[in-house]
């Protein structure tokens, strides 16, 4: 690389770095609002895992996934605890919909694992509907073995990939 090219690259990098303004969000990253004001609830930041109306609460406090045994779509007792929490959250936060993703480990054919992921997602959906969540607020999709959490060849690792994940979205229809 020629010296002039190196200098031009350095100048461009410095120019881009100068465009950033870390102070524009205030000391706490809250857009200068200090994390208080409208939408704040007694010191709990909106969107935090401590806010029971936040999607972060369901993801980090209740749990967003249910694990399954090999070749199974039957919900375990541990899974029922998670799904009961999800159902309660969805019943109390009607502004959200959910997509339930079914997943499988890498063992088996692609077609088999897509079908297994669909059965897992449907099992979760049916349970949430049985707890009172409107069916119209739930969608399912199966990824089979196409989106593993980890790529591996041990049972402990495979177990993490046999799951159904509840992904929340704001309901923009109403």
Language model feature labels by segment:
Residues 1-8:
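Bacterial N-terminal signal peptides that target proteins for export
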Residues 15-18:
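C-terminal motif of bacterial Sec signal peptides marking the signal peptidase cleavage site
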Residues 20-97, 171-174:
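Periplasmic peptidoglycan-binding/tethering modules of Gram-negative envelope proteins
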Residues 78-85, 111, 119, 123, ...:
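Extracytoplasmic/secreted proteins, especially bacterial periplasmic and envelope-associated proteins
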Residues 94-103, 118-149, 162-174:
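A non-catalytic structural micro-motif
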Residues 150-154:
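Short beta-alpha junctions and helix-cap segments that line functional grooves
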Residues 156-160:
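A generic structural micro-feature
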């Amino acid at each position: 690389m020629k010296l002039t090219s190196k200098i031009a690259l350095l100048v461009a990098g410095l120019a881009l770095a100068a465009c950033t303004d870390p102070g524009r969000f205030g000391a706490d990253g809250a857009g200068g609002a200090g994390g208080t004001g409208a939408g704040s609830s007694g010191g709990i930041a909106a969107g935090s895992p401590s806010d029971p109306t936040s999607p972060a609460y369901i993801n980090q406090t209740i749990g967003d996934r249910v694990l399954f045994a090999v070749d199974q779509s039957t919900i375990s007792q541990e899974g029922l605890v998670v799904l009961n929490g999800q159902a309660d959250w969805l019943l109390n936060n009607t502004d959200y919909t959910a997509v339930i993703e079914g997943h499988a480990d890498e063992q088996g054919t692609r077609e088999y694992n897509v079908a297994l992921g669909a059965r897992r997602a449907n099992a979760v959906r049916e349970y949430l509907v049985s707890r009172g969540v409107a069916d119209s607020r739930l969608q399912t999709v199966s990824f089979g073995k196409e989106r593993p959490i980890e790529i591996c060849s041990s049972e402990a690792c495979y177990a993490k990939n046999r799951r159904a994940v509840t992904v929340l979205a704001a309901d923009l229809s109403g």
